[in-house]
Amino acid sequence: MTANRLTLSGTVCKTPTRKVSPSGIPHCQFVLEHRSVQVEAGFTRQAWCRMPVIISGKAHQAITQSITVGTPLTVSGFISSHQGRNGLNKMVLHAEQIELIDSGD
């Protein structure tokens, strides 16, 4: 088996969409914005990305109901390519684990 794991923390930056497939599987899709400072070759650099995320299954329904724009999260799962309506491929993080980050309020 080939490794395909990604853990990314960030803030939800687009309103989540929730749908149920014809087979009854709930899906929640949103975009996670990540910003951090990383060290590469001994130098610091700004790291930034926006990653589309999809989380599926009834086991995750409760946590996805609390996700809104601005919610800080850590998401773990695998990445896969999805083809959009415009014919372009984009990387999507298929979440298998999701954690709300306590903002300390």
Swiss-Prot record:
Annotated source species: Serratia proteamaculans (strain 568)
Function: Involved in the restart of stalled replication forks, which reloads the replicative helicase on sites other than the origin of replication; the PriA-PriB pathway is the major replication restart pathway. During primosome assembly it facilitates complex formation between PriA and DnaT on DNA; stabilizes PriA on DNA. Stimulates the DNA unwinding activity of PriA helicase.
Protein name listed in UniProt: Replication restart protein PriB
Signal sequence coordinates: none
Subunit structure: Homodimer. Interacts with PriA and DnaT. Component of the replication restart primosome. Primosome assembly occurs via a 'hand-off' mechanism. PriA binds to replication forks, subsequently PriB then DnaT bind; DnaT then displaces ssDNA to generate the helicase loading substrate.
Gene (UniProt): priB
One of the GO biological process terms: DNA replication, synthesis of primer
GO cellular component: primosome complex
SSB domain ranges (all copies): 1-102
Keywords attached to this entry: DNA replication, DNA-binding, Primosome
Family label: Belongs to the PriB family.
GO MF, one annotated term: single-stranded DNA binding
InterPro entries (alphabetical): NA-bd_OB-fold, Primosome_PriB/ssb, Prisomal_replication_PriB
Superkingdom per UniProt: Bacteria
Name of one Pfam family that matches: SSB_1
